[in-house]
From Swiss-Prot:
Family: Belongs to the universal ribosomal protein uL30 family.
UniProt keywords, alphabetically: Ribonucleoprotein, Ribosomal protein
One Gene Ontology CC term in the entry: ribonucleoprotein complex
Originating gene: rpmD
Protein name listed in UniProt: Large ribosomal subunit protein uL30
Description of how the protein assembles with itself and partners: Part of the 50S ribosomal subunit.
Keyword Methyltransferase: no
Length: 25
């Protein structure tokens, strides 16, 4: 379960970074 939470947080972080980069453009 802990691994799943870590993966989800990692994925959410990537999505947030992607949105930030797109908005930055």
């Amino acid at each position: 379960a802990t691994v799943k939470v870590t993966l989800v947080k990692s994925l959410n972080g990537r999505i947030a970074n992607h949105k930030a980069x797109v908005x930055g453009l």
